[in-house]
Amino acid sequence: MLTFAEEIMLLMLDDDGLFLPIRGGSVEHVLAGAVLMDLAFANRIDTDPEQLVILDRTPTGNPMLDRVLARIAESDETKDTKSWLETLAGQGTTEIRRQALTSLIERGILESQDERFLWVFRSRRYPTIDGRVEREVKLRIEDALLSDDTPDPRDIALICLVDACDFLRDIFSEREIERATPRIEQLRKMDLIGREVGRVIAKIEESVMMAMALTPH
């Protein structure tokens, strides 16, 4: 089973293995939320509107998750989910990205290709080797949004993350998005971490828009 961060990284790549443009400032919070979700599903943390607490300090065996688990366990301060999202995102999520991509490469799902011109490094692509995994992730999202069946809790959590960074528009047509909007709004309320990710990103975008409006032209 892939982690949420690995699934998000797959969805962030286009057909050429390049990263899609996403909403400004959202990727750090989405990846931070992805790790918190995996820790919650692994019964290492519990969340409620008031606080995020450690249930079990035992390492999961996944370095990406265990690094964040240790960070939370070492904290002397009690924080809620929103505060931890902002803390983890503020510290940067480069290591989360690196570990997620490394795992996908080691599993044979992606490969890493460096593009060079006259021996000068220009960019790195991550083309898909095994497209079945990405198709399965997208199919789960499609089934959860476009059917009347009760979604799996992991699929609800994933949809909340994908919705927060506006990736649904890269998966569905405008007509499908319009049809699924009531369902999306319903699922947003069913996962606390995903809901907080969406709120934090919306707040960031609101601040950016206000700053732009106040900037002299």
Q: Predicted regions span which residues?
A:
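Hydrophobic, aromatic-enriched interface-forming segments
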Residues: 105-114
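Short, structured motif recognition centered on aromatic/hydrophobic residues
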Residues: 36-39, 100-104, 157-166
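Short, Lys/Arg-rich nucleic-acid/phosphate-binding segment
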Residues: 49-52, 114-119
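Short, amphipathic alpha-helical interface elements at domain boundaries
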Residues: 1-92, 199, 205-217
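Short, amphipathic alpha-helical interaction segments positioned at domain boundaries
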Residues: 56-98, 106, 119-158, 168
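Glycine-rich, aromatic-bearing surface loops/beta-hairpins
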Residues: 125-217
